[in-house]
């Protein structure tokens, strides 16, 4: 059985949200094909938490987030509401996957959701059968092409995203400034073995992402630092 609990609006670039400052609303809706679903005014990660905490009456076996209409590659995973919803599932100990379509200026005329759905339908049973390591999710990016045009699967690492953000300053009718973060669409380095490289080669990219963000290679170096005595300033600031 597939149960749907999703945001009622766009949460692009929302990151990992946990709404604690206001109540969350959930309402029954119908999808375009008549499928019953639940919609919430919370973020994608809120929706996963709501489902796990009891909005859905049955135990949850697996979390699927997406299909996002833009790729989530490289550093995008820290911004993405789609990926962080899967992260929320992994926090709860559930096998979790995020699916995104690689729409860009060259292929944005048609969104091939049917391709991404076919990819998800093939991958989800494999995750159910094989499982995932604890606190690991799969970030899946699919070329925005017909299924017949895809060259296959590629297990990848996160690539290097290149952002082209710029500050756009405007003034309201009262002369007060306001700002947009604008700029051109991000690009990336299509290096071999990366999610960006896989998409450039028309492969489905499957990237295991872990919740542990510790930079283990930096630990020994940091342990060699001579950290100052935390009490030295306090003692020197006391009057005689």
Listing of model-derived features with the role each one plays in the protein:
Residues 71-80:
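Glycine/threonine-rich flexible loop motifs
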Residues 3-53, 58-59:
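A cross-family phosphate/adenosyl-ligand binding-site feature
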Residues 90-115:
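Glycine-rich phosphate/pyrophosphate-binding loops
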Residues 111-240:
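Electrostatically charged, flexible surface regions
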Residues 51-57, 84-95:
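Alpha-helix C-terminal capping segments
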Residues 10, 43-44, 68-71, 145, ...:
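Short glycine-rich anion-binding loops that position phosphate/pyrophosphate groups of nucleotides
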Residues 6, 65-68, 98-100, 139-143, ...:
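Short beta-strand segments
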């Amino acid at each position: 059985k597939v149960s749907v609990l999703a945001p009622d609006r766009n949460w692009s670039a929302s990151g990992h949200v946990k709404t604690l400052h206001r109540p969350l609303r959930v309402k029954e809706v119908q999808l375009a094909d008549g499928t019953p679903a639940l919609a919430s005014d919370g973020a994608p990660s809120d929706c996963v938490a709501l489902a796990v905490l009891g909005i859905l009456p049955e135990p949850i076996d697996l979390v699927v987030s997406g299909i996002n209409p833009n790729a989530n590659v490289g550093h995008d995973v820290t911004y993405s509401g789609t990926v962080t919803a899967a992260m929320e599932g992994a926090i709860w100990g559930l096998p979790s996957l995020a699916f995104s379509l690689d729409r860009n200026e060259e292929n944005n005329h048609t969104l091939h959701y049917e391709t991404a759905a076919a990819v998800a339908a093939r991958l989800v049973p494999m995750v159910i059968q094989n499982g995932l390591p604890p606190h690991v999710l799969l970030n899946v990016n699919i070329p925005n092409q017909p299924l017949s045009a895809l060259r296959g699967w590629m297990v990848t690492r996160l690539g290097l995203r290149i952002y082209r953000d710029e500050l756009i300053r405007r003034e309201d009718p009262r002369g007060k400034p306001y700002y947009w973060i604008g700029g051109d669409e991000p690009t990336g380095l299509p290096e071999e073995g990366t999610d960006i490289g896989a998409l450039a080669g028309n492969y489905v990219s499957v990237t295991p992402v872990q919740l542990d963000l510790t930079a283990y290679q930096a630990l020994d170096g940091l342990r060699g630092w001579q950290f100052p005595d935390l009490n030295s300033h306090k003692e020197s600031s006391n009057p005689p």
